[in-house]
Amino acid sequence: MEIGLSHYLTVAAILFTMGTLGIFLNRKNVIVILMSVELILLAVNINLVAFSAFQGNLVGQVFALLVLTVAAAEAAIGLAILVVFFRNRGSIAVEDINAMKG
């Protein structure tokens, strides 16, 4: 049995669905929301690499590396903001973050 494009797309669709459900079903914990966003970006990267490999060019793989770099920076900045927020408020609940609005 050969692993084809449909297998990669199925795995990516499952990861994308898990990430989307994680965002919509969990409205209390910011860390879980950030992890769900990372799952969505991982699904996008799997699609980019799969399409790139099956078409025979490297543009999708280079773009996937760019997306990985941006996702790592986004996660680092998001976690740094959460650490500072936790030090100030003592909680990282979404309701407390909504209280920061102007």
UniProtKB/Swiss-Prot annotation:
Superkingdom of origin: Bacteria
Transmembrane segments: 5-25, 31-51, 66-86
Keywords: Cell inner membrane, Cell membrane, Membrane, NAD, Quinone, Translocase, Transmembrane, Transmembrane helix, Transport, Ubiquinone
Topology with respect to the bilayer: Multi-pass membrane protein
Subcellular location: Cell inner membrane
InterPro entries assigned: NADH_UbQ_OxRdtase_chain4L/K, NUOK/Mnh_C1-like
One GO MF term: NADH:ubiquinone reductase (non-electrogenic) activity
Pfam family, one: Oxidored_q2
Enzyme Commission numbers on file: 7.1.1.-
EC primary class: translocase
Catalytic activity, reaction form: a quinone + NADH + 5 H(+)(in) = a quinol + NAD(+) + 4 H(+)(out)
Gene Ontology BP terms: ATP synthesis coupled electron transport
GO cellular component terms, semicolon-separated: NADH dehydrogenase complex; plasma membrane
Function: NDH-1 shuttles electrons from NADH, via FMN and iron-sulfur (Fe-S) centers, to quinones in the respiratory chain. The immediate electron acceptor for the enzyme in this species is believed to be ubiquinone. Couples the redox reaction to proton translocation (for every two electrons transferred, four hydrogen ions are translocated across the cytoplasmic membrane), and thus conserves the redox energy in a proton gradient.
Subunit structure: NDH-1 is composed of 14 different subunits. Subunits NuoA, H, J, K, L, M, N constitute the membrane sector of the complex.
Entry's family note: Belongs to the complex I subunit 4L family.
Official protein name in the record: NADH-quinone oxidoreductase subunit K
